[in-house]
């Protein structure tokens, strides 16, 4: 699988040279594969939000570099390549608070308009993006501020999707939503990924949620990468995950408890289906020992 985004020795220091100096990223090396869904997990202050702001050039590294398709996104004069902002789309946490246009269509059209596209192309992208996030066409001329919180979030996501980024970065996309709202957003992401084939990064604090959708998990701890692997491999290090201030899925907890009680089960599982398979395998082997 080819790499679309990469960081090499990426370091970011806030307040460098002052009494308030803080290292937010400490020589981070990651490779993000084209077409994958990567979950980014970490406790508050772990560096995950700083990391994603580097991926589309909102922040400039103190050291190291970010490469898009093998090329640094920063030139020798310290300028970020303009195309980076269009190719790596970033949806901030609580994006509904960033809506500002009079109508939904105009808000979604803001990004494509800045790409200097023909009006016909902009209109087509607005329609396609609304459909992708489940917004009815008749809402196009309505005010985004008249929508529910969940619908506003869909508008904000549609505004980034309309630029057709190669990489879509979502910072805590389900924050503040009820369980039904969270399920809807994750379903939206799954559908968009299936239709577009785009690379997607989802920042979350919930292992339970993110493990259900991600191909790999990037676990941040104290400005460094703790793990970057499949969910199953990551959850095989449950003690280290918990030590980093994170939780593990309930299914994984149950399997670990069964292991402690003498049952020969796989403790790296994290879905109900995987747990059922593990229990059947345990039963065939004779159960507890």
Predicted segments with their positions:
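Conserved catalytic motifs of ABC-family nucleotide-binding domains
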Residues: 164
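Conserved ABC ATPase "signature" region
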Residues: 120-138
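Catalytic Walker B motif of ABC-type/P-loop ATPase nucleotide-binding domains
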Residues: 168-171
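Conserved ABC ATPase "signature" C-loop
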Residues: 222-223
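Conserved ABC ATPase signature
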Residues: 143-147, 151
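ABC ATPase NBD Q-loop/coupling interface
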Residues: 65-83
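Helix-to-loop junction immediately C-terminal to a conserved catalytic motif
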Residues: 56
């Amino acid at each position: 699988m080819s790499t679309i985004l990469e960081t090499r020795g990426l370091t970011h220091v806030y307040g460098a040279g002052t009494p308030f100096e803080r290292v937010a990223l400490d020589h981070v090396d990651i490779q993000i594969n084209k077409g994958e869904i990567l979950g980014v997990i970490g406790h508050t202050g772990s560096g995950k939000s700083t990391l994603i702001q580097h991926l589309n050039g909102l922040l400039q590294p103190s050291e190291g570099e970010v490469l898009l398709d093998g090329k640094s996104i920063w030139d020798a004069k310290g300028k970020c390549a303009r195309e980076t902002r269009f190719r790596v789309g970033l949806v901030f946490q609580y994006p509904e608070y960033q809506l500002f246009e009079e109508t939904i269509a105009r808000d979604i059209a803001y990004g494509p308009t800045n790409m200097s596209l023909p009006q016909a192309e902009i209109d087509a992208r607005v329609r396609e993006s609304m459909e992708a996030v489940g917004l009815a066409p008749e809402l196009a001329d309505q005010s985004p501020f008249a929508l529910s919180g969940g619908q506003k979030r869909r508008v904000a996501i549609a505004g980034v999707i309309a630029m057709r980024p190669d990489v879509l970065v979502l910072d805590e996309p389900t924050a503040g939503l009820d369980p039904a709202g969270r399920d809807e957003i994750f379903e939206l992401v799954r559908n968009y990924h299936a239709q577009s084939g785009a690379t997607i990064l989802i920042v979350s604090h919930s292992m339970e949620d993110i493990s259900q959708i991600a191909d790999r998990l990037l676990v941040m701890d104290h400005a460094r990468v703790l793990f970057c692997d499949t969910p199953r491999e990551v959850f095989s290090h449950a003690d280290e995950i918990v030590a980093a201030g994170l939780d593990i899925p309930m299914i994984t907890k149950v399997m670990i408890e069964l292991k402690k009680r003498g049952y020969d089960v796989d403790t790296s599982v994290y879905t109900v289906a995987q747990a059922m398979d593990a229990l059947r395998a345990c039963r065939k082997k004779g159960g507890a020992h």
